[in-house]
Amino acid sequence: MIRFLVFSLLILTLFLTAPAVEGDVSFRLSGATSSSYGVFISNLRKALPYERKLYDIPLLRSTLPGSQRYALIHLTNYADETISVAIDVTNVYVMGYRAGDTSYFFNEASATEAAKYVFKDAKRKVTLPYSGNYERLQIAAGKIRENIPLGLPALDSAITTLFYYNANSAASALMVLIQSTSEAARYKFIEQQIGKRVDKTFLPSLAIISLENSWSALSKQIQIASTNNGQFETPVVLINAQNQRVTITNVDAGVVTSNIALLLNRNNMAAIDDDVPMAQSFGCGSYAI
């Protein structure tokens, strides 16, 4: 009897101390600093399995089986209210989120697949009336990304909106969420711009938007360059601090050496390209090129 009790207590201890899900990362707005936000984004990048590194940039895996394909991000606002966000670790796409006993998923095939593995114990599942690409989100929000503030206070507001699910502002909140997590993980410049706004908001420059819209193209050309003496097969156009279009043709460019932090696997390009808006606008910025 005593042995049984000891064994039972041991099992219970192991259960209580085990991590919830491998790869989970968390960020709390209360007491947040530029440094703590940077640690959060660094931990998010570390939670993404990669195939190998090209020019010291992790190349994300092309696929993973079942639940291994997803990781959770736990975000807590100033009011101590938490939402859990599910991402696809092969492309850092947000699939949906959970607030309390309710899960919310984008209206797309990839999110439907994710729902088989994450938030399965939620008592209620809501399918959002739009997919997760920016074009659809901007239509639902009635505004473009350039007019939606970013910064840690904006992230706090986004968490609150999603926690209580305000349908009128959910699409805008999701764009703030995506840029504050996925896009910041993809680009050091976006991480830095958001992280240094601890107590104020800012409107994203069109240069930020151009980086976001160019992730697939840059990833593809960097992979091509790895077997082409560092040269791009097709140039990628970005914008410099003088609001001028700059053509990136090789891996010596600053956006490659000191900005992009993750590479989308070429095997996943078709699905991502389908989600990039056809019309891309560009503007000024200060990232290294």
Swiss-Prot record:
GO terms for biological process: defense response to virus; negative regulation of translation. Coiled coil: none annotated. It catalyses: Endohydrolysis of the N-glycosidic bond at one specific adenosine on the 28S rRNA. GO terms for molecular function: rRNA N-glycosylase activity; toxin activity. Its EC number is 3.2.2.22. Keywords: Antiviral defense, Hydrolase, Plant defense, Protein synthesis inhibitor, Signal, Toxin. This is Ribosome-inactivating protein karasurin-C. It comes from Trichosanthes kirilowii (Chinese snake gourd). It is an enzyme of class 3 (hydrolase). Abortion-inducing protein. It inactivates eukaryotic 60S ribosomal subunits. InterPro entries: Ribosome-inact_prot_sf, Ribosome_inactivat_1/2, Ribosome_inactivat_prot, Ribosome_inactivat_prot_CS, Ribosome_inactivat_prot_sub1, Ribosome_inactivat_prot_sub2. Belongs to the ribosome-inactivating protein family. Type 1 RIP subfamily. The active site is at 183. Residues 271-289 form a propeptide. Residues 1-21 form the signal peptide. Gene3D superfamilies: Ricin (A subunit), domain 1, Ricin (A Subunit), domain 2.
